[in-house]
Structure formats: C-alpha cells, structure tokens
Regions:
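Flexible domain-boundary/linker segments
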Residues: 60, 148-151
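Intrinsically disordered, low-complexity sequence elements enriched in Ser/Thr/Gly/Pro
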Residues: 20, 151-152
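Non-heme Fe(II)/2-oxoglutarate
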Residues: 1-64, 85
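Catalytic core of non-heme Fe(II) oxygenases with the double-stranded beta-helix
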Residues: 69-139, 143-145, 152-155, 161-165
Length: 166
C-alpha cells in the first residue's frame, strides 16, 4: 500500500515526478509519515538551531507542500545505485536539507564525498556519515557525483518553509 502511494516506480498517483529526470526510484513522504517516525520534531529542532545562527528568533517552520499532489510534502528518499547521480540544482522553500540514511560498505573516499556544494566559486565536499543531516540555503547549488559502488546509497532530502513571527 505505501509502495503504491509513495514510490516513483510503483505509484498510482498521477503526475508523480521523476526529479531532475534521473530515472531512479524516489520515495515521497506524507506529513503524517514524517510525524509518525519523529522526523518532524527532530527537524524542527535542527531548523531552529540553524535559524538561531542567523539571528532569527521567532519563526514557525513547516514542510513545503509538494508541487504535484496535496498528499505529499516536499520530502523524499533518493535511492542511488551504481552510475546514479544528481545533476547540479537548487531547491524551493527557505531551508533545505539532506540526511544520510545508508552508505555502501564498500564506499571509498570518492563515494563518501559524492555530495558537492558550490559557494563563491569554492567547492565543498563534506564527508558523509550515516545519520548526519546537512541544512543549507535552498539557493545553494549542489549535486551528487556518479556513484561507483554497486550497493545502495540512500538519502532523505527535504524543503522547509519558515514564517517569521512578528
């Protein structure tokens, strides 16, 4: 049932996107699913710390709605296998993020630094560790280089909206 609702390979939801025309499986999440697993509370705390570092004290944070269905929020799982990659892109919303869910055991330094950001002509390739969450400005150009490993690399990506309370 969840597979038929949420997976780009199996969904019966009309207009289910193939993000950036990558052609690999994407699993979209509903707000209720994120609430049920505790991710909404976790990311609200992280986003508050992120905003505090910019001097933003009074804000309400919520999920950006998906553009293709009212069922989903703008939060999805990417399932990368050998030769999968994500081209340079940016995001919608006010805060974007990536959580590393799974890394292949056979990952080498190339695969462990496959997530790349560019800022002021400087490239940043942070080391990926399972469980690590990266929050960033959605306009920050980033991409994932082609994976060399056969085993799965799984990430959770999301976009948040921030409403400043005055």
């Amino acid at each position: 049932e969840t597979k038929e609702l949420c997976s780009s390979k199996h969904s019966k939801v009309e207009g289910f996107p193939d993000l950036l025309s990558r052609g690999f499986e994407i699993v979209y999440m509903t707000g209720q699913q994120l609430e049920d697993i505790g991710f909404t509370q976790f990311i609200a705390h992280m986003a508050k710390e992120y905003l505090d570092s910019y001097g933003v004290q009074n804000a309400q944070i919520h999920w950006n709605q998906s553009h293709f269905s009212e069922l989903f929020v703008d939060a999805w799982v990417n399932r990368y296998f050998e030769d999968n990659y994500t081209p340079p892109h940016n995001h919608a919303g006010n805060i974007s993020g990536i959580t590393i869910l799974e890394l292949p055991e056979e990952s080498d330094l190339y695969d462990l630094r496959s997530l790349e950001f560019i800022w002021n002509n400087e490239h940043h390739r942070p080391e990926q560790v399972v469980g690590k969450t990266f929050l960033f400005d959605p306009q920050l150009m980033h991409w994932v280089t082609k994976q060399k490993c056969v085993s799965e690399r799984r990430t959770f990506s999301f976009n948040l909206v921030v409403d400043i309370v005055r």
